[in-house]
């Protein structure tokens, strides 16, 4: 039966791990925030329960270890530090590897010793803990084999409900001592309520009075609690005797005892605030539950099948339109127009179903940036914007690695160490921005840093050294042409190779991935100001609007999303400047390429009048010269397969309404 729920378990576990990572990153910025500590604790507690239910004992055990560490932080026994979070993050990474192993092999055995890790982090937490400032003395009592009790004498003020505060204060006025006791049972303890009853029995023997328990006595009797119970006690005996008595009870992992020397009643305002907060949280939960209830999980394969069928419908519609043009059957015009509208609406709905927020990609990066910056001894303020920007799920699967490389480059090459930034008059903390937005029919993703920028002179020297250009050619290059050398395979300006970057691989791979998605990439950089890398992707790779053009009676398709403008030109409009053909549009010089020359196909004598399709690739423009324009159409992109994967000029093919094939021009691959 469990196999049926494995997919749901994996999906939900990944979501919890992502939320846990985000919470821990926030906790590092606000280590005293008890709400964040509680949130992380609850996430691990839920993960532990899910893993236990599915029978993944190693994962459940590891979650329990991390849960206990955060529980100590909740009880102010230890403080959250960056070093402690390093250990917790390492544990979260182990859980992630377990999930990957569960997906691939159905087992959570990752070949790593969980006990060793658990002992290490427990030891670190104990040795590195900082005692709260208000605690004066602390004594420990140990059983014969292991530590069970901790007793704390402190001047601690506890905020309690009015009735409890009144009782404890009255008891102190009469000379009694008042204590806060936390009993933690061992994991897997049977008959938990019976063990807590033994605690009550011991307290009764010592003539102690239990004023309040958390959870309630009824919940304890029904075992509606995990492994912890909190008590407020009035006692005639001192802390040491209490600790000695309670530590002797079997199956108790630990007892924490604090003497309460002052109590404070909740004010009316506090009560109202708490009530309001609870109401708000209840409303938030109800709203979240409402949203969840309106969503369903759909297998990706089913979405792909739906998209394929949608594509076939678009092709069928185009063929019907083509047939009607030949026979001019007016009676069918209205029906066909209605069919076209329905097809278009259906197409838009299917496209939206495939869209997912880019946060699915972005959310993995804050943790990576934090770890890498710390490893390289740099301080980085990482800002993400536009995480709710939606794009086709195909891009989500493909764009992650290129963005990862760009972020690593920014931290390694771009952002300077603290001392260097101060010497330059910059803020000591570097800024790294990852943003996404919709721009027309494109998704624009930018990676921007305020680091040292790219040394263009260094790029030119390296290009000359590699024999890519000579010195005379170098003098004529624009800034953009210089920066484009970074996309040449094996090109790197970094002298010293690090394990992060500088191995001469990466940017060419980034460019190849982006262009395989019919996208474009460009770089802007200013020395000592920073660098910005911009990626432009079409909204979808499935069905696109394209301009059909003709060259030598062959039909090609150019994606509308890449087209800036279209104009008719004559042979005389094309000028030769610095060994390249250009045209001038409203004072702007734009390079042009004859499509037949780019594709190396035979062409009849150049026509007096031709069409120039001006396309935009990143922040560059150029013109594609063709014989004629055939109009705009919705086309379904079909892959050319592995055999033609090296042909950069084409990004795919499409079946037209008359059954013929049109190759789709990859505007990034022409230049």
From Swiss-Prot:
Residues 1-102 form the HPt domain. GO terms for biological process: chemotaxis. GO terms for cellular component: cytoplasm. Pfam families: CheW (PF01584), H-kinase_dim (PF02895), HATPase_c (PF02518), Hpt (PF01627), P2 (PF07194). Its main location: cytoplasm. Keywords: ATP-binding, Chemotaxis, Cytoplasm, Kinase, Nucleotide-binding, Phosphoprotein, Transferase, Two-component regulatory system. The modification Phosphohistidine is found at residue 45. Residues 125-155, 267-286 are annotated as: Disordered. This is Chemotaxis protein CheA. It comes from Thermotoga maritima (strain ATCC 43589 / DSM 3109 / JCM 10099 / NBRC 100826 / MSB8).
């Amino acid at each position: 039966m469990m196999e049926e729920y494995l997919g749901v378990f994996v999906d939900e576990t990944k979501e919890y791990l992502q939320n846990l990572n985000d919470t821990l990153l926030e906790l590092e910025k606000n280590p005293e925030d008890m709400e964040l500590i509680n949130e992380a604790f609850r996430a691990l507690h839920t993960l532990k329960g899910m893993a236990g239910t599915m029978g993944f004992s190693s994962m459940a055990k590891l979650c329990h270890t991390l849960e206990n560490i955060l529980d100590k932080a909740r009880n102010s026994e230890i403080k959250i530090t960056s070093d402690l979070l390093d250990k917790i993050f390492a544990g979260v990474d182990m859980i992630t590897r377990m999930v990957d192993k569960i997906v691939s092999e159905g087992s959570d055995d990752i070949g790593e010793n969980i006990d060793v890790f658990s002992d290490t982090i427990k030891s670190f937490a104990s040795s590195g803990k900082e005692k709260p400032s208000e605690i004066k003395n602390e004594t420990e009592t140990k059983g014969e084999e292991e530590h069970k009790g901790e007793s704390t004498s402190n001047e601690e003020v506890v905020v309690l409900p009015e009735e409890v505060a009144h009782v404890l204060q009255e008891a102190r006025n009469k000379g009694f001592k008042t204590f806060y006791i936390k009993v933690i049972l061992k994991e897997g303890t049977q008959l938990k309520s019976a063990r807590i009853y033994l605690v009550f029995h011991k307290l009764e023997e010592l003539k102690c009075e239990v004023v309040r328990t958390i959870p309630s006595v009824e919940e304890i009797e029904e075992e509606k609690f995990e492994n912890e119970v909190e008590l407020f006690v009035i006692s005639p005996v001192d802390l040491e005797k209490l600790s000695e008595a309670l530590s002797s009870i079997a199956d108790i992992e630990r007892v924490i005892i604090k003497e309460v020397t002052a109590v404070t009643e909740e004010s009316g305002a506090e009560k109202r605030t708490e009530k309001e907060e609870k109401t708000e949280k209840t409303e938030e939960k109800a709203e979240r539950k409402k949203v969840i209830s309106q969503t369903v999980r759909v297998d990706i394969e089913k979405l792909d099948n739906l998209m394929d069928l949608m594509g076939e419908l678009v092709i069928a519609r185009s063929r019907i339109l083509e047939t009607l043009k030949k026979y001019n059957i007016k009676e069918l015009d209205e029906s066909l127009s209605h069919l076209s509208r329905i097809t278009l609406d259906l197409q838009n709905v299917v496209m939206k179903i495939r869209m997912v927020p880019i946060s699915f990609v972005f959310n993995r990066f804050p943790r990576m940036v934090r770890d890498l910056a710390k490893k390289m001894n740099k301080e980085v303020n990482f800002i993400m914007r536009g995480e709710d920007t939606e794009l086709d799920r195909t891009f989500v699967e493909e764009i992650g690695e290129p963005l990862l490389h760009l972020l690593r480059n920014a931290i390694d090459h771009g952002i300077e160490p603290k001392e260097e930034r101060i010497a330059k008059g910059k803020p000591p903390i570097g800024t790294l921005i990852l943003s996404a937005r919709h721009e027309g029919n494109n998704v624009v993703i930018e990676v921007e840093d305020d680091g040292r920028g790219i040394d263009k002179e260094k790029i030119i020297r390296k290009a000359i050294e590699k024999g890519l250009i000579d010195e005379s050619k170098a003098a004529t290059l624009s800034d953009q042409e210089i920066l484009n050398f970074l996309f040449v395979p094996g090109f790197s300006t970094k002298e010293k190779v690090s394990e992060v970057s500088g191995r001469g691989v990466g940017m060419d791979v980034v460019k190849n991935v982006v262009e395989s998605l019919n996208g474009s990439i460009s770089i802007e950089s200013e020395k000592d100001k920073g660098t910005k890398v911009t990626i432009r992707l079409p909204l979808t790779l499935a069905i696109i609007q394209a301009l059909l053009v003709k060259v030598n009676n062959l039909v090609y398709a150019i994606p509308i999303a890449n087209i800036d403008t279209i104009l008719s030109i004559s042979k005389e409009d094309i000028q030769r400047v610095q060994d390249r053909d250009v045209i001038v549009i409203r004072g702007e010089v734009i390079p042009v390429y004859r499509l037949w020359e780019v594709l190396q196909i035979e062409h009849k004598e150049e026509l007096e009048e031709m069409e120039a399709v001006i396309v935009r690739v990143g922040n560059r423009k150029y013109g594609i010269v063709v014989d004629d324009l055939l109009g705009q159409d919705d086309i379904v992109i079909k892959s050319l397969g592995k055999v033609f994967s090296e042909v950069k000029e084409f990004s795919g093919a499409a079946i037209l309404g008359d059954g013929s094939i049109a190759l789709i021009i990859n505007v990034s691959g022409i230049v």
